[in-house]
Swiss-Prot record:
Keyword field: Amidation, Hormone, Secreted
UniProt lineage: Eukaryota, Metazoa, Ecdysozoa, Arthropoda, Hexapoda
Top-level taxonomic group: Eukaryota
The species this protein was found in: Diploptera punctata (Pacific beetle cockroach)
Gene Ontology terms: cellular component: extracellular region
Membership in a protein family: Belongs to the sauvagine/corticotropin-releasing factor/urotensin I family.
Protein name: Diuretic hormone class 1
InterPro entries: Corticotropin-releasing_fac_CS, CRF
Amino acid sequence: TGTGPSLSIVNPLDVLRQRLLLEIARRRMRQTQNMIQANRDFLESI
């Protein structure tokens, strides 16, 4: 038994963690966009 075949098997937990991190990053980016937009609107309303 070599290390070749076992490397091709992806750990489901790793995949889940990867997806979670991506989702969190996406949400954070969206929140930042919303905050920037809110600040812009606020400054224009003054």
